[in-house]
């Protein structure tokens, strides 16, 4: 099987903005990723408890369970799961960034999300997060 025909990573995307979530899904699927979506942290944790994902992408600012709370719970469930946090805000607290592997501003989504996913899928040693201001 050639590298080009190998399936790409399975991603879990979590965001309470359903329209944006569908856009993320469609965008990532055009690059060959398998994408499962959840509209809340608890729903995402339930999916992660039953399925294995190569990368988890979570919005920081969500009701019920924030992206930071989700990431902490996800680390308990699957300690090695790579997590990318997204936010429209540039003032995400440092403690939230410390529990994820990468951070991407939503304003830079189109140019920064794919490189972050590829890095997390292919790298054995990553910094705790990368902040794109």
Where are the regions a protein language model picked out?
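Receiver (REC) domain active-site loop signature in two-component systems and cognate sites
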Residues: 62
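Alpha4 helix (beta4-alpha4-beta5 surface) of REC/receiver domains from two-component response regulators
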Residues: 69, 89-115
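Conserved acidic segment of CheY-like receiver
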Residues: 8-19, 24-28, 56
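Non-catalytic signal-transmission and effector/linker regions of two-component phosphorelay proteins
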Residues: 1-10, 109-133
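Short amphipathic alpha-helix used as the core "switch/output" element in two-component signaling
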Residues: 46, 68-79
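Active-site beta3 strand of CheY-like receiver
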Residues: 51-57
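Helix N-cap/capping motif at the beta->alpha junctions
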Residues: 37-46, 67
């Amino acid at each position: 099987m050639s590298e080009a025909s190998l399936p790409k990573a399975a991603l879990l995307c979590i965001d309470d903005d359903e329209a944006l979530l569908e856009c993320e899904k469609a965008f990532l699927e055009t690059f060959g990723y398998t994408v499962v979506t959840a509209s809340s942290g608890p729903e995402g944790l339930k999916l992660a408890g039953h399925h294995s994902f190569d990368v988890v992408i979570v919005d920081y600012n969500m009701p019920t369970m924030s992206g930071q709370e989700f990431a902490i719970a996800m680390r308990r469930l699957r300690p090695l799961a790579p997590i990318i946090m997204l936010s429209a805000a540039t003032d995400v607290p440092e403690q939230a960034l410390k529990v994820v592997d990468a951070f991407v501003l939503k304003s830079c989504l189109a140019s920064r999300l794919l490189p972050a996913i590829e890095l997390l899928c292919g790298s054995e040693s990553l910094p705790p997060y990368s902040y794109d201001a």
